[in-house]
């Protein structure tokens, strides 16, 4: 056997060992990620998180300076049923029907998307909760994929009621205003359990853009949006909340 053949054999062996090492470490990283994600979701299923990814991101990269952070955790049964229904009506009317990811909505959003435009309108309430809890804010296909994975885990391990409780306690209702209890006290000077239907609709109307929208006093646009949410609430009906169990 010539030196050329020996050299070629050594090179091929090195490449084979490199690929084996690559796949071995990739498998280990995947297993570690799966275990970590299961632990994270299982933890927030039973323990109220002291902080979360979205809040940390805002603290590190605040859109504005000198923001006073307001937050107070409140259990779901202390949140007005109107408020629970309002966020479902505003953000995810199929919340009780899907398993965390609404594949029918994704299919529709893809069909309606203009070429070159990002995918919009397909994130479920569960996906929003997963993003706020665990992921970064910038949009990418990687983040959307992770968001879907965590949403499926949340729906499976936490269930609808706990997911809704998490969402209502960590979602941002204004600069530094986290959770419905802090929002209710800031905007209406009352606890979340005493919100009226109109007040709940106004708070839910903030959710797409809480840093830009205002409800104190509400603009004409916000009144129209709250009116639309109230109509959707009537169509869904309070019986929707029974399907959370």
Swiss-Prot record:
Residues annotated as transmembrane: 29-49
EC number, UniProt record: 2.4.99.28
This protein's record includes keyword Lipid biosynthesis: no
GO molecular function: pentosyltransferase activity; peptidoglycan glycosyltransferase activity
Membrane-topology descriptor: Single-pass membrane protein
The protein's annotated pathway: Cell wall biogenesis; peptidoglycan biosynthesis
Localization of this protein: Cell inner membrane
GO process terms (BP): cell wall organization; peptidoglycan biosynthetic process; regulation of cell shape
Pfam family, one: Transgly
Keywords: Cell inner membrane, Cell membrane, Cell shape, Cell wall biogenesis/degradation, Glycosyltransferase, Membrane, Peptidoglycan synthesis, Transferase, Transmembrane, Transmembrane helix
Primary location class: membrane
PANTHER family (alphabetical): BIOSYNTHETIC PEPTIDOGLYCAN TRANSGLYCOSYLASE (PTHR30400:SF0), MONOFUNCTIONAL BIOSYNTHETIC PEPTIDOGLYCAN TRANSGLYCOSYLASE (PTHR30400)
The protein, known as: Biosynthetic peptidoglycan transglycosylase
Gene label: mtgA
């Amino acid at each position: 056997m010539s030196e050329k053949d020996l050299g070629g054999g050594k090179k091929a062996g090195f490449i084979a060992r490199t690929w084996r090492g690559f796949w071995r470490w990739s498998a280990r990283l995947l297993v570690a990620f799966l275990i970590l994600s299961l632990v994270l979701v299982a933890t927030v299923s039973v323990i109220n998180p002291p902080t979360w990814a979205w809040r940390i991101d805002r603290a590190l990269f605040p859109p504005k300076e000198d923001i006073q952070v307001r937050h107070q955790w409140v259990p779901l049964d202390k949140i007005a049923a109107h408020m629970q229904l309002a966020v479902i009506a505003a953000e995810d009317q199929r919340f009780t029907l899907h398993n965390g990811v609404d594949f029918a909505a994704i299919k529709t959003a893809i069909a309606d998307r203009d070429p070159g435009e990002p995918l919009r309108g397909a994130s479920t309430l569960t996906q929003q909760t997963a993003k706020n809890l665990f992921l970064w804010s910038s949009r990418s296909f990687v983040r959307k994929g992770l968001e879907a994975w965590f949403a499926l885990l949340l729906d499976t391990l936490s269930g609808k009621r706990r997911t809704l409780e998490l969402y209502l306690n960590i979602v941002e209702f204004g600069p530094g205003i986290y959770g419905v209890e802090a929002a209710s006290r800031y905007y209406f000077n009352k606890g979340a359990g005493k919100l009226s239907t109109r007040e709940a609709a106004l708070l839910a109307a903030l959710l797409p853009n809480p840093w830009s929208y205002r409800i104190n006093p509400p603009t004409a646009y916000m009144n129209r949006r709250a009116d639309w949410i109230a109509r959707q609430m009537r169509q869904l009906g309070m019986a929707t909340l029974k399907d959370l169990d």
